[in-house]
From Swiss-Prot:
A Pfam cross-reference name: GTP_EFTU_D2
Domain tr-type G: residue ranges: 8-283
Organism per entry: Bradyrhizobium sp. (strain BTAi1 / ATCC BAA-1182)
Family: Belongs to the TRAFAC class translation factor GTPase superfamily. Classic translation factor GTPase family. EF-G/EF-2 subfamily.
One GO term of the biological process aspect: ribosome disassembly
Protein name: Elongation factor G
A molecular function (GO) term: guanosine tetraphosphate binding
Cell compartment(s), UniProt: Cytoplasm
NCBIfam families the record matches: EF-G (TIGR00484), PRK12740.1-3 (NF009379), PRK12740.1-5 (NF009381), small_GTP (TIGR00231)
């Protein structure tokens, strides 16, 4: 079957925002107006089409980014709904990785919120072209112009209004389109499906003229001819202005800002027009780079004629189809039944069912093309971030980076039957979400779950209980401490064992030094002249790595350390890889002692938004949690307090804050860095764990 839509008519975009800015509602309206949903789903009724896991419908937040295809004005929209809660930042990160553009949704009452900053920075990291939608214009306190100011102050970006609101709060009627200089007013009776283009209301004419000028001036700066014409008194026509706004979006010169109220069905159709007019097609963004099987850099252009390459960006377990792998096809054509190679894992796979997803409905397809986002059923080996490609033209596309988890809980199944179910369920959950890790504590035999925050782990436990029917006891959350050495250490160690027959002999000299923060573990062999034969060096590495998982302070993983093997001795008969493994293990443990290992604890960046009356109590409480206040500023009539606080002092903070502020203060927290724990904390942790 030939391609139905030319690749320049594709818009692969995500909707990103802070929690509760109305992202899922905006997506729902998009699906409704593009004719994909016959009934609008409301988030607060737990009926939104995109939020299809029970946990999402109950909590009214979006956890997994479902991919949906819709059509508008002859263009094909592939929409990825991303979560706005800080514990699910990983979902946003991997969505942005496969998108070409994004709509950033703001709550007009709140402006730019902490998680907006986080997702915006992720957008900057992947250079994603963006447009901004100031939503909830019908809410009390909605202020479109505050949103514009916030984008400058908090995101350091240049916003340009391409619409202005007509009225606000209860009187929000519609918007003025500054490109066409017409007003758009929605008809309340038709669920927003009908609207009229009318003249700009007289009382807003001056304001519209002022902001139209700002828009034109920002746009003509991007084109010499348009600039010359403008200076001579000729304004750009509508087509030229749209072309220049598109150019600005693609280059990040400025970000067009629109307004509306998705919940009240106002402003969604012009937002869709803006997605089509201004966001990039796969041809407008740089072609993806990768490395071929010889390690050379190669480029895969968005073209059906190029060799096949696709990236798995999400894995989900579907009750009807089994494992579904969401993939973005970057180049070539994918046909069901063909063989591909998972070049990341060097495994062959056969493409079985191919599905086009609409939230949680699905349509079987036989072929997919460059630019498509498809769901593949039944892949056995694929994990998030893997590349699948043509076996004869192998490539590994740019890898995704995933953050380290900072919080962990122990989980114990209640019965033998639960034990088996738990193993299967955890393997599936870990495959779906790379920021969720599962490990076993060798000493206690407990299963440990690690994640990005309390909510992240709460939801995983909830899925285990509901979806997989596992009955288990859950331990209290624990902090993921780390250890590192603070000074260099040199160690010589000899391992000897003579017990008749073949003995064991190995001698190693290690130089162990601190690496810079975030530098990780680095091993280097500086052996010259065969003091330790090549075949034994992997044994040395294995011995060192066996200690990295449990350091000498309190048995936590060792990070940021450089180890060099500088000398050694061996015996022709008695030496073996195992003997060198034992020797290097003991030598490295000794080096960790000598190098004055210390305990590191995760420090969280905390932002509290509180009415002014409670500021003193909030700051006092953060100080009592060993928090360091970084600064305060006013946002509207609320005070915003930024602090760095150790994670171990933040458990249960949500309830404390609620009672301290009568439920009026809110906070967000995300991992910032690891820092050395004070001596008293270290002693307490050692007593508990060592």
């Amino acid at each position: 079957m030939p391609r139905q839509h030319a690749i320049e008519d594709y818009r692969n975009f995500g909707i990103m925002a802070h929690i509760d800015a109305g992202k899922t509602t905006t997506t729902e309206r998009i699906l409704y107006y593009t004719g994909k949903s016959h009934k609008i789903g409301e988030v607060h009724e737990g009926a939104a089409t995109m939020d299809w896991m029970e946990q999402e419908q109950e909590r009214g937040i979006t956890i997994t980014s479902a991919a949906t295809t819709a059509f508008w004005n002859g263009k094909r929209l592939n929409i990825i709904d991303t979560p706005g809660h800080v514990d699910f930042t990983i979902e946003v990160e991997r969505s942005l990785r496969v998108l070409d553009g994004a709509v950033c949704v703001l709550d007009s009452n709140q402006g730019v919120e902490p998680q907006t900053e986080t997702v915006w920075r992720q957008g900057d990291k992947y250079k994603v072209p963006r447009i901004v939608f100031a939503n909830k214009m019908d809410k009390t306190g909605a202020d479109f112009f505050k949103c514009l100011a916030d984008i400058v102050d908090r995101l350091g970006a240049k916003p340009v209004a391409i619409q202005l609101p007509i009225g606000a709060e209860n009187n929000f009627k519609g918007c003025i389109d500054l490109v066409t200089m017409k007003a758009i007013v929605w008809n309340d009776e038709s669920l927003g499906a009908k609207f009229d283009h009318v003249e700009i209301p007289a009382e807003l004419a001056d304001q519209a003229k002022e902001y139209r000028e700002k828009l034109v001036e920002a746009a003509v700066e991007l084109d010499d001819d348009a600039m010359s014409a403008y200076l001579e008194g000729t304004e750009p026509d509508e087509a030229t202005l749209k072309r220049l706004i598109r150019k600005a979006v693609l280059s990040g010169a400025f970000y067009p800002v629109l307004c509306g109220s998705a919940f009240k069905n106002k402003g969604v159709q012009p937002l869709l027009d803006a997605v089509v007019d201004y966001l990039p097609s796969p041809l407008d963004v740089p072609a993806i780079k990768g490395t071929d099987d010889k390690g050379n850099e190669v480029v895969r252009k968005a073209d059906d004629k190029e060799p096949l390459s696709l990236l798995a960006f999400k894995i989900m377990d579907d009750p009807f189809v089994g494992t579904i792998t969401f993939c973005r096809i970057y180049s070539g054509i994918l046909t069901s039944g063909t063989g591909v190679v998972n070049s990341t894992r060097e495994k062959k796979e056969r493409i079985g069912r191919m599905l086009l997803m609409h939230a949680n409905n699905r349509e079987d397809i036989k072929e997919a093309y460059a630019g498509d986002i498809v769901a593949l059923a039944g892949l056995k080996e694929a994990r998030t971030g893997d590349t699948l490609c043509d076996p004869n033209n192998q490539v590994i596309l740019e890898k995704m980076e995933f953050p380290e988890p900072v919080i962990e809980i122990a989980i114990e199944p209640k019965s033998k039957a639960d034990q088996e179910k738990l193993g299967i369920a955890l393997a599936k959950l870990a495959a779906e979400d790379p920021s969720f890790r599962v490990s076993t504590d060798h000493e206690s035999g407990q299963t440990i779950l690690k994640g990005m925050g309390e909510l992240h782990l709460d939801i995983k436990v909830d899925i285990l209980k509901r979806t997989y029917k596992v009955d288990a006891n859950i331990g209290a959350p624990q902090v993921a401490f780390r250890e590192r050495i603070t000074k260099p250490a040199n160690v010589d160690y000899t391992h000897k064992k003579q017990t008749g027959g073949t003995g064991q002999f190995a001698a190693v000299s290690l130089v162990v030094e601190p690496n810079e923060p975030g530098g990780g573990y680095v091993f280097e062999s500086k052996i010259v002249g065969g003091a330790v034969p090549k075949e034994y060096i992997p044994g040395v590495e294995k011995g060192i790595e066996s200690v990295l998982g449990a350091g000498v302070v309190a048995g936590f993983p060792v990070v940021d350390v450089k180890v060099a093997l500088v000398d050694g001795k061996y015996h022709d008969v008695d030496s073996s890889a195992l003997a060198f493994e034992i020797a290097s293990r003991a030598a490295f443990r000794e080096a960790l002692q000598k190098g004055k290992s210390v305990l590191l604890e995760p420090i969280m960046k905390v932002e509290v938004v509180t009415p002014e009356d409670y500021t003193g109590s909030v700051i006092g409480d953060l100080n009592s949690r060993r928090g360091q206040i970084q600064g305060q500023d006013m946002r509207g009539n609320a005070n915003v307090i930024n602090a760095m606080v150790p994670l171990m002092n933040m458990f249960g903070y949500v309830n404390n804050l609620r009672s301290m502020s009568q439920g009026r203060a809110t906070f967000t927290m995300q991992f910032s860095h690891y820092a050395e724990a004070p001596a008293n904390v270290s002693a307490e942790v050692q007593k508990k764990f060592a």
